[in-house]
């Protein structure tokens, strides 16, 4: 790291030089932070619905404040605008060629930001001598919907192009911040995990990555081109417009504010925004590409939580995710006999109050992840993990080890307001720190060596399960895995986007 520090004591400025630009950040408790670094030009005006562009070179970038988030629903109370393609870096003072964690946030492709406190890299970098990078990418209408039917002015999958650009910037600059460009691990959760499942299949991205961590991603969460364009046409109808000029004239704020309302209009909830197989950027569904061994054979660590979809027991969240539609599309093509058998085996395997939660969790998230791992493990090494721990309050609320509950453990961030309420009392706080250190050490080991000290994905699908006690057991019972393999859902998930007009996804 070519540093020019005033001091390494808390909250003092620190500077590095990369590609003839000075980056001014902050140093606190031995960890240096650079926030809001632009990796591409603003996407406002002429940049809207177009590929990201390399930013103009400047003499200095003051990187001591997080940059704007991408336009989205107003519930996210941070600055938001179209000049949102920025990233954040955490590295130990004096770091040199350390493994790099490139983290992609989730949010159903319509919300979220790399500056979320849960992804703050301070604690993780202090605990494990790695470099952490978090990014913003375009979301929802601006980043996902395909308006290319309006003309060449409109590019599909801008969100994916943004991630590829951020990866390229990281590869080209991270050595000057203390990272090793030849050892970049991409990690993402939920929608971010879905993107990570795609990246090894994209030559534009795969050239920069050496390992990947998929946390509760859905590798079936992709549309065909025609479906993506139908959704874009539905958005124009929803907004009461019919031309490219009208679409380009809508303010970013109005587009962001419409993001959530549009999901109610479509009645698809969280499935209203999904990347699509356009033939140029995304060649096919990730499951199909991996099955055909058309991906970079890198080590993979794939994980999930014990009770992924438990929060959907809350009606407001069930409506937001479009749970009724998810369930309908996940089972409507199955025979009545098979549906009955699947429900029966869940009732026999789990407690009465837990059976439906586990069924939803497997259908929406865990079954597609296991199918992806099955195919990838034919040509590369794959490991599993599962987050099983839940606090007394989480159990009382019925959310248990819910979707994304593993993230504070990876990053070591248990004290910010959104999570603090879950961990009460000295004993629980001690437990979460112990589990956090375990999962952080495993992450650092994986990033450094590309291996983990338990068996790879096999017929038994053994994973490391983080709870009050560490266990190694099947991620999903074999009997349940076998039933899911019999489904039409499984069959159509492996049909190329170019062979069928049907959606190869559970959404």
State the predicted function of each range:
Residues 29, 33-56, 314-334, 460-471:
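Short Gly/aromatic-enriched secondary-structure transition segments
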Residues 74-244, 261, 290-313:
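Serine-hydrolase-like catalytic core of hydrolytic proteins
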Residues 211, 254-430, 442, 449:
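Substrate-gating cap/lid region and adjacent catalytic-acid/histidine neighborhood
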């Amino acid at each position: 790291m070519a540093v020019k520090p005033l001091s390494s004591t808390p909250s003092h400025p620190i500077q590095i030089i990369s590609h003839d630009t000075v980056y001014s950040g902050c140093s606190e408790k031995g960890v240096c932070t650079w926030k809001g670094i632009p990796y591409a030009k603003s996407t406002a005006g002429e940049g809207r619905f177009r590929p990201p562009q390399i930013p103009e070179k400047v003499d200095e970038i003051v990187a001591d404040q997080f940059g704007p988030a991408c336009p989205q629903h107003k519930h996210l109370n941070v600055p938001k605008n179209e000049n949102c393609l920025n990233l954040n870096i955490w590295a130990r003072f004096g770091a040199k060629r350390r493994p790099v964690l490139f983290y992609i946030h989730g949010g159903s492709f319509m919300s979220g930001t790399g500056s979320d406190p849960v992804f703050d890299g301070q604690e993780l970098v202090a605990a494990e001598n790695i470099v952490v990078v978090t990014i913003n990418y375009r979301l929802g209408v601006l980043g996902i919907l395909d308006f290319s039917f309006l003309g060449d002015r409109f590019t599909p999958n801008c969100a994916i192009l943004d991630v590829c650009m951020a990866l390229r910037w990281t590869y080209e600059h991270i050595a000057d911040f203390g990272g090793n460009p030849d050892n970049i691990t991409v990690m993402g959760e939920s929608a971010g995990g879905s993107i990570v499942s795609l990246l090894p299949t994209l030559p534009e991205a795969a050239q920069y990555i050496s390992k990947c961590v998929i946390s509760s991603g859905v590798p079936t969460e992709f549309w065909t081109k025609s479906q993506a364009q139908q959704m874009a046409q539905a958005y124009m109808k929803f907004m009461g417009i019919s031309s490219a000029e009208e679409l380009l004239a809508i303010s970013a704020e109005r587009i962001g504010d419409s993001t959530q309302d549009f999901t109610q209009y479509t009645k698809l909830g969280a499935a209203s925004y999904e990347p699509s197989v356009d033939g140029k950027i995304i060649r096919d569904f990730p499951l199909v590409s991996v099955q055909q061994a058309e991906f970079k054979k890198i080590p993979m660590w794939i994980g999930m939580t014990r009770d992924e979809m438990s929060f959907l027991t809350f009606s407001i969240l069930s409506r937001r995710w479009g749970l009724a539609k998810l369930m309908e599309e996940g089972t409507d093509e199955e025979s009545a006999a098979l549906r009955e058998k699947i429900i029966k085996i869940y009732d026999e395997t789990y407690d009465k109050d837990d059976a439906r939660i586990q069924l939803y969790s497997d259908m929406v998230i865990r079954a597609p992840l296991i199918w992806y791992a099955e195919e990838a493990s034919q040509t590369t090494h794959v490991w599993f993990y599962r987050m099983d721990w839940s606090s007394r309050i989480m159990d009382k609320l019925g959310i248990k080890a819910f979707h994304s509950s593993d993230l504070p453990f990876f990053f070591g961030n248990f004290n910010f307001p959104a999570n603090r309420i879950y961990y009460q009392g000295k004993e629980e706080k001690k437990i979460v720190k112990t589990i956090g250190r375990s999962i952080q050490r495993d992450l650092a080991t994986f990033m450094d060596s590309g291996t983990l000290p338990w068996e790879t994905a096999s017929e038994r699908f053994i994973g490391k399960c983080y709870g009050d006690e560490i266990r190694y057991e099947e991620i999903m019972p074999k009997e349940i895995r076998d039933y899911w393999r019999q489904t039409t859902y499984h069959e159509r998930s492996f049909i190329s986007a170019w062979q069928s007009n049907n959606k190869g996804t559970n959404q």
